[in-house]
């Protein structure tokens, strides 16, 4: 009789262990899914943002050529310095983003480390947006120089490229922030 009791108890324990393992596997799968969804949105948003940033730089270079031809590039030194500082900040942010992405992808089986990678990606993105804000300020400064030199119309084409780039960056930022919201909602 006692032997049968122990067999039943052992059976219940084994079944309980399987249920617990199944539930924990389900929880891990759900955690992995939201992390993958967030990563995908953040990665796609980053790519779009980066494409927009390249357009802004291209438009700035177009305006630089106009300024050289019109003879007032030396008056754009302050704006160019702010733009360069912004590019440097954005580059540091991109480096942190890349480190975070590598940390995430290298540690998919370790959720706590993978989450740290997502956090690094978020920090890198925000650093990059700070740099982009600085670049926008420098572009505005250079546009004021062009206006004072009577060359606003000559900056039109470069500024169109810059505006398209800024719109692309804004759309990329929206997508990135949707992924970030998923991370913040599920953080442990």
What are these regions (language model features)?
Residues 25-87, 91, 182-188:
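Immediate post-signal-peptide N-terminus of mature secreted/exported proteins
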Residues 2-13:
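Bacterial N-terminal signal peptides that target proteins for export
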Residues 37, 44, 51, 64, ...:
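Asp/Glu-rich intrinsically disordered low-complexity tracts
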Residues 12-22:
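Bacterial N-terminal signal peptides
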Residues 98-131, 138-142, 148-150, 156:
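Charged heptad-repeat coiled-coil "stalk" segments of single-pass membrane proteins
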Residues 20-21, 26, 97:
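Hydrophobic alpha-helical segments of integral membrane proteins
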Residues 70-116, 120:
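Mid-chain, structured segments of secreted extracytoplasmic proteins
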Residues 35-38, 49, 58, 130-188:
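C-terminal amphipathic alpha-helix
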């Amino acid at each position: 009789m006692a032997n049968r009791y122990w067999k039943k108890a052992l059976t219940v324990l084994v079944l309980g262990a399987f249920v617990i393992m199944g539930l924990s596997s389900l929880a891990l799968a759900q955690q992995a899914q939201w992390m993958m969804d967030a990563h995908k949105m953040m990665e796609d948003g980053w790519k779009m943002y980066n494409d927009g940033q390249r357009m802004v730089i291209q438009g700035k270079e177009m305006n630089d050529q106009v300024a050289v031809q019109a003879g007032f590039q030396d008056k754009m030194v302050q704006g160019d310095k702010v733009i360069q500082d912004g590019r440097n900040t954005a580059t540091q942010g991109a480096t942190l983003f890349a480190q975070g992405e590598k940390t995430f992808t290298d540690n998919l089986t370790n959720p706590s480390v993978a989450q740290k990678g997502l956090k690094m990606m978020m920090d890198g993105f925000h650093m990059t947006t700070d740099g982009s804000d600085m670049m926008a300020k420098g572009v505005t400064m250079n546009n004021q120089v062009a206006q004072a030199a009577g060359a606003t119309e000559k900056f039109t084409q470069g500024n169109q490229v810059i505006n398209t780039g800024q719109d692309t960056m804004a759309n990329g930022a929206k997508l990135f922030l949707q992924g970030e919201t998923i991370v913040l909602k599920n953080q442990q």
